[in-house]
Amino acid sequence: MTTTNDTKIKTGLVLEGGALRGLYTMGIVDVLIENQLHFDGLIGVSAGAAFGCNYLSRQPGRVLRYNQRFSHDWRYCSLRSWLRTGDLFGAEFAYHHVPQQLDRFDFETFKTSPTDFYMVCTDVETGRAVYQKAEQEMSIDELCEWIRASASMPLVSRIVEIGGRKLLDGGVSDSIPLRYFQEIGFQRNVVILTQPRNYVKQPTSFMPLMRLALRKYPHMLSALMHRHEMYNAQLRYLEEQEKLGQTLVIAPERKLKINHTSHDPA
């Protein structure tokens, strides 16, 4: 797509997180792949990054397939994994063993994709968002670690140290990074949410536990405390941008019948 002066309008795909609610997102992304719809950039938060990378590797159906296959494997996601390793979603099994051995992620196709791929994490020492682009020289292990950092939910995940930073779930600091994508040049965007349009985020009920687990990181605690305010403000911004005609928002009509974690392969 071009403007009258032949300046290309860059298109972006913005994927919210939501753990296994991201399966809704991937149903839509699979359709985009199958219909060969191209975006210049994709930015994913948490599950949006973990699942959205398959848009670049052109592997429709892969996310649903491996989630169904490993839904009852304690190494993938379980209380047992959390108690034994500190991670609800197994760091080694889910983020390395599955994509590199059991249900291979097509890293070569990912690397040659013309679509830029960005992951959002939260720096626990500053409480601010970190936006990491998948550079050409990045190895599959490094990519998987950045994705793991983006998807590492507080309380049920260990802090991920990478790139000289201590990182956790990107949704804490920038749940719907449309504004960031616009600022770096993606003018026309499709945003896929995992909550219905009438959703209003409430303050977390886990702050007492957060204060205990993250007591060394006051800026992270502040971000967690105000996360609902940030999120609801982003929803208002989405509405404004949608009215301007440069943003298309796709969201479920009603609350999805799936929790953050699920062991039901159906």
Which residue ranges define each predicted feature?
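Patatin-like phospholipase
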Residues: 1-45, 53-266
